[in-house]
Amino acid sequence: MREKQENERRGKGLKQYIADRRLAAVSLVLGVLMGLMILLGIRYSRNELIYRTAGQFLGQLAGWAVCMTVMVWAICVGLDALGRGWPEIRDFQFGKFLPVNSYQKRTQARRGKDCEDQGSSRDVESQGRESKQRAAKNSDLGTWLKWMFLSWCVYLPVFLAVYPGIYSYDASAQLLQFYGKLPLTTHHPLIHTLYLGLCMKIAGRLFHTYQAGMALYALSQSFFMSAVFSLCLCRMKARRAPQWLCVASWMFWILNPYLTVFSFVTTKDVLFGAFFLLSFDTACCLVEDPEHFWRGMCQKKEDLDKERELDKEKNLNETGSRKEVGKTGDWLLFFVSVFFMCLFRNQGIYVFLFFVLAVCLFLRKKVYRINWFIGASLLVAALWYVLSGPIPTAFGVGKGDAREMLCVPMQQLARIYHEVPEKLAPEEKEYIETLIDPQALSEYVRVNADPVKSGFHTEVMQADMGRFVRTWAEIGKRHPDIYLDSFLMGNWGYWYIGDNQYWISYILYDGAYLEDDLNILHITRNSHFQALSDWLREATLTPAFQSVPMLSVLLNQAFPFWLMLFAAGFAVWKRRAYEILPMMLLLGCWGTLLLGPVVSLRYALPLIYCVPRLLEMIVGLTGKR
């Protein structure tokens, strides 16, 4: 009899999901979008057409869309079933491992459900509260130290394996500028150039070898990365994330060979990614709990004061510490992280302004403290502008080349010139040859804009910007299919989850630009753990992981974008669409990647770092009605 009742209850639950129109709509939209990305991704990864007619394309798209729609629906139902706790799950007490948001905890506290001793006096309560507050603070520091220790149990052997560090990517060019061999410009972030150069100079003077300078840079950067990851794990624990998620997040950040190796690489993308992660984490906290963050930040003053009084009397979290409404610590961490994010990569300011615009559109009403947010955002933008423009110019620092932002149009023009020159008018062909060196045009490749970019004459474009725009637009108007194909061919790795990725060759484990005329400090690899070094080289330079189903997805640079789409759809289904707001940071960053010169793992690092936080958002939404 009992088994029959359980089966009926389970059947009701499944019928409830089947009848859910919102879930069906979300699954369909995501399914069609994911199916389209898979279909196009297969075409571009193979560099050949897998469909010959529009009918074939639509037929294959329909098939992929149905498969992905069913998959999205099943994942949503499965996660929600786990969160709500069906009978079998309750038997295993799975629900206690799921995070409980502070609004639920406050409601339970007000109803007296979490009070073990309702007859205790107020004095005893306050004493217990103070002791728990002290214990919570000590626990936070202890947790941070624990994660740091565990991280360095992994990082120390890796440092010995790659000693003195991985001198790669733009390090040679930056040091040539730092030591005056090349003119100093803002092409590379000044803060990173100074940081790298000072490490070399300080350690070089102290130890009389620039190998020590490289080691100082690698150690300081990896220490900062482990500190950021440990801080994020502490914040996860404070938000009552399940223990398994904290452990899985640590494994993803620290045991992932790609991310671990990058912690010792001389590229600005690593530190940019760290500050991006902090910005995203704090932005998520601002919307995850409306009672304590968005309402606390934007609520009218009289309502805010009432809420604070209620919290002082009744609101205790599980550690006994009192949660303050509108806590400013997260906002301070957010703006500091955003500021340094912008300094370490120019694209950061565009991502941040895109997020601010989304916040202003979402919070249209002028309520308490919204002006503070706008004012602080403008202050960050102004500080970035002053430190990136007027001050460097005053000290004789040159500006970066504008061609870095024009990879998409120059590739489109080069594609037309290289593959279908007969479709160009004589004056158009002549202008393209003036704009881009013929030698660079002959070296054109579909998946990398660097060869064409190296021969692009910015001064020709700037001399007559109108002609450049007109020529590009007129050719594109005649051949929109080639323009679109060129654009997608240059960035398919950021939105297609599949094998045959070409980004694997851009993890420069053994360094780059090590010729004597470029490597003026003569930095060389001197591994003290050769076996581990050989394993890391093989792991980062060969696509062997693609044979493992789960790893081939988790270590794919398109995975963060897919996870973001799923998290956004899941939030819409749960009628918590405001949780999409912090994802505007991810969407903005992803959008800038589409305009880049090549698909590379280091460019996608900021998005990859945010994967555990996205998973926490999804887990936090499970079971909510």
Region spans (language model):
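Membrane-interface alpha helices of multi-pass inner-membrane proteins
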Residues: 330-345, 357, 379-384
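Loop-to-helix entry region of an early transmembrane alpha helix in multi-pass inner-membrane enzymes
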Residues: 190-194, 205-230
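Transmembrane-helix motifs of polytopic, lipid-linked glycan transferases
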Residues: 115, 219-240, 278
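Membrane-proximal stem/loop segments at transmembrane-domain junctions that anchor or position
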Residues: 394-529
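Specific aromatic-rich, kink-prone transmembrane helix
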Residues: 179, 231, 271-294, 338, ...
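Extracytoplasmic catalytic/substrate-binding loops of multi-pass membrane glycan-assembly enzymes
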Residues: 162-174, 183-199, 207-212, 606
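Membrane-interface anchor segments at the N-terminal boundary of transmembrane helices
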Residues: 60, 212-216, 490-582, 586
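Start-transfer (signal-anchor) and selected internal transmembrane alpha helices
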Residues: 2-35, 55-155, 621-625
